[in-house]
UniProtKB/Swiss-Prot annotation:
Belongs to the class-I aminoacyl-tRNA synthetase family. Gene3D superfamilies: Arginyl tRNA synthetase N-terminal domain, HUPs, Isoleucyl-tRNA Synthetase, Domain 1. Keywords: Aminoacyl-tRNA synthetase, ATP-binding, Cytoplasm, Ligase, Nucleotide-binding, Protein biosynthesis. This is Arginine--tRNA ligase. It comes from Shewanella sp. (strain W3-18-1). InterPro entries: aa-tRNA-synth_I_CS, Arg-tRNA-ligase, Arg-tRNA-synth_N, Arg-tRNA-synth_N_sf, ArgRS_core, DALR_anticod-bd, Rossmann-like_a/b/a_fold, tRNAsynth_Ia_anticodon-bd.
């Protein structure tokens, strides 16, 4: 509906250009918003006020001219001017009912699909030296929800799990594994539960033993040179680490697979060429023995230029080098239209610099969009980064296990007679969903306080509330036998039917915001509002006890569409639904 009004306004702008009211080369930014007060219609635009200067007319006069020039539309019941020049659109109830009717049998719920693009999404990307911790949660689940929405809207999505599987720390890890093998024989292997212990022990040896540190650096050189022995150990370590990651992904219900792993090591052979190409373009400068690039736009508070370090004085490469190689690969090989990076906001300057450099060096096509979709931190109730009571990093598996235990207690307290198998399954879904939804429902760029008590509440904008709301809607159909709605028509008569219908019709524009801005919290807010709209509708409009079959079937269709929208919306967030709670 919103896109339809935008289209009408675009046609009006073109007419104004032809009439000479606006310059022929003028490009208008058309904004259409939902009204908060229904007495002001369903949709509104401030276009007249935006055009008043260039058109040389006062806003209300221009608003009337826009209304007079608008193409006729069956969707629009009436158009009014409000205040200094706002234009309010009242949508025709029968047109809204027709739109909802079309959604009933459509797998995309009546959403008009955009022109498909190839979108590379870089998310999760843990270092393979340690177990995944809570710091990996946000990138993993925010990225995954946006990926799901992109695919649902018909885009070709290429997931890229840019794991940290290369670099100097691997020499340290390989050297320590070599020592363990020497002591315990070839049968010695690293258990998943020992990853953290192993890493700390290797780091301790590296810091305390000069001989060990020398061997670690030697192994890095041998690894980078393709030494078969080093590569064998390196692959084994990565396999163990990746197995752990994918156990966490499976538990989280995240769609990443082994095939999506394209880590730093994948670009190792390209790094030397990156340096050569930057040098050939005259972009490299030597600074304290390192090879760097200075860009005029990036300076510190003192006005001094900030470098992008491409190669260290000892010949080693940095994140910027592999990021540039990855961008070139994603442009030239993957042919991406957009590349989305779900990485901590604290890396904002890094991405601004490498995005700018990639375009400057022509490593990527000019029309390829590079987007850093950063996020804030997850904090404890003291407002500081989330830690264990002893001050250590919280492992992601431990967090999810505690969520499961707490959810089991909650579900058991509400269903004391339920069998253990069913309780366990419901608790699994509720626990994981609560953790994911609590994160996804917050604005991506904000820090937030992690609270089990809040996220497991059945009140407010939480996963348990929405899971219950879905079971309540779906439960209506369990009380009906022999239902045939194939000939049923949606009719919007009661005000609460219209409110629910209007909310259902917004699903497409909400998903477009999710994929355009990388903002799953917008979808969370929408689903919460949809559940509320259905609750108001259900209280005011009897469904199974409606006055007649036509009204009953219409309300059943609205209920069915609500259930499908809630389920699809939750699934796009990576959240399973339940048939009972």
């Amino acid at each position: 509906m919103k896109s339809h009004i935008q289209s009408l306004l675009e046609q009006t702008i073109e007419s104004f250009k032809q009439q000479g009211i606006l310059p022929a080369d003028f490009e208008a930014r058309i904004q259409v918003d939902r009204t908060k007060d229904k007495s002001h219609g369903d949709l509104a635009t401030n276009l007249a006020m935006m055009l008043t200067k260039v058109a040389g007319k006062n806003p209300r006069e221009l608003a009337q001219l826009i209304i007079d020039t608008l193409p006729a539309s069956a969707f629009v019941a009436k158009v009014e001017i409000a205040g200094p020049g706002f234009i309010n659109f009242f949508i025709n109830d029968s047109a809204l009912a027709d739109q909802l009717q079309n959604a009933v049998n459509d797998e995309h719920l009546g959403i008009k699909l955009p022109t498909p693009q190839t979108v590379v999404v870089d998310y999760s990307s843990p270092n393979l030296a340690k177990e995944m911790h809570v710091g990996h949660l946000r990138s993993t689940i925010i990225g995954d929800s946006v990926v799901r929405a992109l695919e649902f809207l018909g885009h070709k999505v290429i997931r890229q799990n840019h794991v940290g599987d290369w670099g100097t720390q691997f020499g340290m890890l390989l050297a320590y594994m070599e020592e363990l093998r020497a002591k315990n024989g070839e049968q010695a292997h690293l258990e998943l539960s020992d990853l953290e212990t192993f890493y700390r022990a290797a780091k301790l040896r590296f810091d305390e033993s000069a001989e060990f540190a020398t061997r670690a650096r030697q192994l890095v050189v041998e690894l980078q040179s393709g030494d078969e022995y080093c590569n064998k150990l390196w692959r084994e370590f990565n396999d163990i680490s990746l197995s752990h990651c994918h156990e966490v992904y499976a538990r989280l219900g995240v769609s990443l697979t082994r095939a999506d792993v394209h880590g730093e090591s994948a670009y190792n052979a390209d790094l030397e060429q990156v340096v050569k190409d930057l040098d050939a373009q005259g972009l490299l400068t030597e600074s304290n023995g390192a090879k760097v690039v200075f860009q005029e736009a990036f300076r510190n508070k003192e006005g001094e230029p900030l470098p992008v370090i491409i190669q260290k004085a000892d010949g080693g490469y940095l994140y910027a080098t592999s990021d540039l190689a990855a961008m070139r690969y994603r442009s030239n090989v993957l042919k991406a239209d957009r590349v989305l990076y779900f990485v901590d906001l604290r890396q904002a300057l890094h991405f601004q610099q490498v995005f700018s450099l990639a375009k400057l060096a022509k490593f990527v096509r000019e029309d390829m969009s590079l987007e850093h979709l950063g996020f804030g931190t997850m904090n404890g109730e003291d407002g500081r980064p989330f830690k264990t009571r002893s001050g250590g990093v919280v492992k992601l598996v431990d967090l999810l296990e505690e969520a499961n235990v707490r959810a089991l207690e909650l579900v058991r307290s509400k269903n004391p007679d339920m069998d253990e198998e069913t309780l366990a399954e419901i608790a699994r879904v509720v626990g994981i969903s609560a953790v994911k939804y609590a994160d996804l429902s917050k604005n991506r760029t904000s820090d937030y306080i992690f609270s089990f008590e809040q996220m497991l509440s059945f009140e407010g904008n939480t996963a348990p509330y929405l899971l219950y709301a879905y079971t309540r809607v779906a439960g209506i159909f369990k009380r009906v036998t022999g239902l045939d709605l194939s000939q049923a028509k949606i009719v919007l008569e009661h005000e609460k039917e219209k409110d629910l219908g209007n909310k259902l019709a917004q699903f497409g524009e909400i998903l477009n915001r999710v994929v355009d801005k990388g903002q799953p919290h917008v979808l969370c807010a929408y689903l919460y509002e949809l559940a509320g709209a259905f609750s108001s509708f259900y209280e005011a409009c009897p469904v199974l006890a409606a006055d007649n079959d036509e009204q009953k079937n219409s309300r059943l269709l609205l209920s069915q569409l609500t259930a499908r929208t809630l389920q699809k919306g939750l699934n796009l967030l990576g959240i399973e639904t339940l048939e009972r709670m």
